[in-house]
Amino acid sequence: MKRSIYLTAIAMTMLFTACTKEEVADVPSSDQTIEFLVNGNPSGGNFTLFSFEKGVAVPTADSNSLKWDFGLRFETFIINSKASGPGNAFVQILNQPYTAVTSAALSGYKFDTTASQKAIKGLEWYTYNSITRQFSPIAGKTFVFVTANGKYAKMEVLKADPANDNGEPVTPPTRPTRIKYTLRYFYQKNGTPNFQ
């Protein structure tokens, strides 16, 4: 009887210890590459909202929430803070290659102060060819975010291609209705500014 109680106590201790370790263990963060379509109209329509935490586009219906970190329309970024949303997101663009950015700075961030004063200015990160309607991301530009919920992420725009509603490439004289973005990012789930 004593042996049975003793073994039960050991088993419960091991189970409790295992559960505790699982609860506090961080899910490893890693580089992700995604493609998604955004509105190709430079002057109107909805922004495509993106969540680093979920790694997916967020419905426009959730624009007044903390479920998204940044939005894109054509080549215009909005950040979920101040003038553009209820979150506490901030961003800065570093003149460093993506792989060289191993941690987030603790200062130097910007937010959308008004509808016309955005944290990210278009020509900071790309050149545009008006004949081919092609955006070319500038090499060595890395976006570093404080997300809407106060965590850290880094991002690089790999491609921004003119496309139709199905995401298929278009060339002049066809006008694109969408821009197909390819992004690489690292979201630090544990809340530290470390990207390694």
Could you describe each region identified by the protein language model?
Residues 2-9:
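Sec-dependent signal peptide recognition
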